[in-house]
């Protein structure tokens, strides 16, 4: 449905939305002080800031509409509200654009920001745009460089050699996830393993705190907390050395970590990570081992890739001596499923009690010895399924007869007494490598001098700015190819030196931006007074895909800044809300070409292209550019208005669930927006009477009760992020108002005006433009809706004049009765028996029992 201009009663959303957005901006309605002094409660609402790709999508609309509803409602409820917006502006897409299209990444980014900002403004967000910044602003990344130096001086940032995935064509380091089947995700070139000196943040210093802090985050989804607990990965076990039967390359023993020292007597083999020092020593003398290691390294190095890959191994020919029984030796294998950066990079395999070890042992014909048996099956034999449950230790010498927990303690004590090992707590979490060989990022403010070593850039020289003329005409890091930027004098001795040419991982940029928003123009990274007032963020809103990395890094950064005395809180986000995705059918032609929804005509039982060709309709799935099943918000807003888009993305499902975009749903939302405006015009045209609201009876009182119940219900629903429930209640109130149109009852005009005023203010956080337009019809003297207080329900009107009780006979519903709330059993039973249909059904029967559930049920148990 396109906007109807010939109907004088229709809401002209195009003109109205522009008019009210201009009014809000002119009056600075959403500006907030850095540290307000009014003593009011604060509410910091923040949606994860976007990457400036150039166009917003409907997922953005849903994400920012959720935050906007909360921000607008809290502002109306009397809170000081901070609701800022910025741009996560560094990253690979801008650099790719520079290389592929010969455009300046800064200009490309700024142009995209301008386009997306205009789009977001059209959505009508209650954002304090005076706080806007982009992470590529030198002022912002200069403060980030200052933070880095603070962390470096505190020992929380350091540089060391690290194995990396190197793309020889793009000449850059790739994350594990960017290695696909051993090749670079972009270049397709075979990836090489190299060792480079990289910068790291010592996040492991905070592992215990980060884990314990999750228990305090009661307003986070449990799913996210569980994901972070697993990522941090605390485990208790034993770290011990296993002696090689014969040294290899100067190595005499292998350190091993295990959470199951109780199963040591079930050891069948030792497995090494492909990049373990002993594996390297074996490969130096064994070409077959070297080839196997190269295969492992090219097959994908992410945990997901390793987990999915077939479990393979290489027998080194080495053997180790069992730590408890020197008469036993076991083979040493190199295995593709062992990770060097977890534990010690070596494991002992106990196939009977670990499924992965069992699969490996069966594949290569290795021993399987049961050492834990169920209490009721001491002779357990393991087939193709490992026994991983609790039980009694068997076939284990001095551990026999103990339960698993006691055996763990006894095994650790024995290792300690022999000087071979000890009990330890291990963490899956590893220090965060933040070096990236990319030019379009925040420069790391360090200088390398052959005389002084690595030294910091003096703070007076911050920010270290990116050059304006980055050379993207050759592979590799453009900063390496910019001699006048790269070559500098050492700030300590004056000798010739070189800048650090690595830039920060963009996750660093988003790990503290929420603190900067509190006072974005302050001369320090995080202003103490402002962060003291606003932090933590009360409502942080974004996708579940950020559950681990971004959210964990932000928690680390906040704790590090707290340790340094820069912020007063240890946790950045008191509340976290992860919204669902927007979904849509996908469409393609018979030759496999994907189509946009606007290129398809849906018929009753099939679909065609605009020129009549057959279209294959695919499943409803996440909107994606690759499948073209996206809906352009700009087109939706032009056709239906921003309020329709906002209403629809919040109305169909709970916001934590996915929502399917449908034409019918958009049409329904559009009709409601139009209806609200028409209702306002109708109420504005009512003739007043002399009956005060407080004395309203009959139909007027009934409408007042509906109004105040809606106020209570919508308030509760918005507090609980149940926007679809709030919208359902708003539909009901609109229906209640419409049902009274044209009726002449005492007090009804005032009750209708009260109801309409409440409906406008309750709907305003969701559909703010039409709310302002409707308010101008009904209550122009009240001023902007955005400045009006939230309606408050009157307790007296929440009480029901009557309740409906179900009347049952033998548990089957036979009728209903209306009674005053709280009617006693005698009254309820008498009323039920007086109901003609019930009396007829009871006639001739003997009532054995009368059951009364107050305000709910009357039930008669009878016999003929």
Swiss-Prot record:
Motif 'KMSKS' region mapped to chain: 622-626
Subcellular location: Cytoplasm
UniProt KW keywords: Aminoacyl-tRNA synthetase, ATP-binding, Cytoplasm, Ligase, Nucleotide-binding, Protein biosynthesis
BP GO annotations: leucyl-tRNA aminoacylation
Chain ranges for the short sequence motif 'HIGH' region as given in the UniProt record: 50-60
Lyase found in the keyword field: no
Source organism, top-level taxon: Bacteria
InterPro entries reported in the protein's UniProt record: aa-tRNA-synth_I_CS (IPR001412), aa-tRNA-synth_Ia (IPR002300), Leu-tRNA-ligase (IPR002302), Leu_tRNA-synth_edit (IPR025709), M/V/L/I-tRNA-synth_anticd-bd (IPR013155), Methionyl/Leucyl_tRNA_Synth (IPR015413), Rossmann-like_a/b/a_fold (IPR014729), tRNAsynth_Ia_anticodon-bd (IPR009080)
Family: Belongs to the class-I aminoacyl-tRNA synthetase family.
Family matches, as HAMAP family: Leu_tRNA_synth_B
Protein's name in the database: Leucine--tRNA ligase
